[in-house]
Amino acid sequence: MFRGATLVNLDSKGRLSVPTRYREQLLENAAGQMVCTIDIHHPCLLLYPLPEWEIIEQKLSRLLSMNPVERRVQRLLLGHASECQMDGAGRLLIAPVLRQHAGLTKEVMLVGQFNKFELWDETTWHQQVKEDIDAEQLATGDLSERLQDLSL
């Protein structure tokens, strides 16, 4: 399980260094193999360990290619999916087209989200957090039943 937000730097080749606390888990569970794709709702990337991505692929394969909305989701997620292998130094190379999609330059937020990471431009991440907090404060009466049952 991945949690927390960590500031990491992209080097001049577009590689990011995976925080040490995640490396062993990624090596054990995925042999360091990851898949990166775009998020279709936000200007960030989604970074999955390969076994988790394979579950997503199975779900995507069940969508109907004749349904235009489902086909569009398949095209966006699979069409942008890029395999990346963690090297001996614990770095992952993020494809240029993906970096461009999310506006990633030097400072990147690596955000743990249970079975995957999100990769955000640092400035965009902070703006999104502010928007999320503001929206949550406005929506106190609009909580779903699942959120109402969540006790923190």
Swiss-Prot record:
It comes from the Bacteria. InterPro entries: MraZ (IPR003444), MraZ_C (IPR035644), MraZ_dom (IPR020603), MraZ_N (IPR035642), MraZ_sf (IPR038619), SpoVT-AbrB_dom (IPR007159), SpoVT-AbrB_sf (IPR037914). Coiled coil: none annotated. PROSITE patterns: SPOVT_ABRB. GO terms for cellular component: cytoplasm; nucleoid. GO terms for biological process: negative regulation of DNA-templated transcription initiation. It is found in: Cytoplasm, Nucleoid. One of its GO terms (molecular function) is DNA-binding transcription factor activity. Signal peptide: none annotated. Keywords: Cytoplasm, DNA-binding, Repeat, Repressor, Transcription, Transcription regulation. Residues 5-52, 81-124 form the SpoVT-AbrB domain. Its main location: cytoplasm. The keyword Transferase does not apply. Gene3D superfamilies: Transcriptional regulator MraZ domain. The keyword Repressor applies. Negatively regulates its own expression and that of the subsequent genes in the proximal part of the division and cell wall (dcw) gene cluster. Acts by binding directly to DNA. May also regulate the expression of genes outside the dcw cluster. Belongs to the MraZ family. Forms oligomers. This is Transcriptional regulator MraZ. It comes from Shigella flexneri. The gene is mraZ.
